[in-house]
């Protein structure tokens, strides 16, 4: 009986391991190293985390200081997404208009009234 349980448990683990790659939801999923630049401002280095399910995308911008904001939107056929950004407590923070394709991100991010050009590539 104990051996049967082990065989079943090992079989379940092997099944889960085999299906894990199929659980990757969308081609835009991942973390992207982003440089945000605006005239008269220092460049900002941020990390953009993207989660995709179908055409729905959720994203978070992680700043080196430990601050983060989030947003969501629908990915267009041309791989463009736009929407609002919010702080962790739900307070409005800004907006974004990005194109995410082939491991690269380009577009604009508005943070507290300043418009930044954003560009970067997937890091994982």
Regions found by a protein language model. Name each.
Residues 20-24:
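Sec/Tat signal peptide C-region and signal peptidase I cleavage site
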Residues 1-9:
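Bacterial N-terminal signal peptides that target proteins for export
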Residues 8-18:
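Bacterial N-terminal signal peptides
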Residues 1-2, 17, 106:
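A detector of low-complexity, intrinsically disordered, Ser/Thr/Gly/Pro/Ala-rich segments
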């Amino acid at each position: 009986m104990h051996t049967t349980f082990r065989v079943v448990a090992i079989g379940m683990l092997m099944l889960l391991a085999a299906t894990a790659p199929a659980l990757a939801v969308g081609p835009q999923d991942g973390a992207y190293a982003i440089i945000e630049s605006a005239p008269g401002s220092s460049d900002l280095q941020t990390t953009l985390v993207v989660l995709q399910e179908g055409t729905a995308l959720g994203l978070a911008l992680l700043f080196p200081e430990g601050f983060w904001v989030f947003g969501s939107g629908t990915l267009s056929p041309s791989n463009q997404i736009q929407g609002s950004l919010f702080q962790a407590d739900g307070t409005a923070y800004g907006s974004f208009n990005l194109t995410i394709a082939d491991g690269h991100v380009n577009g604009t991010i508005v943070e507290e009234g300043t418009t930044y050009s954003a560009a970067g590539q997937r890091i994982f």
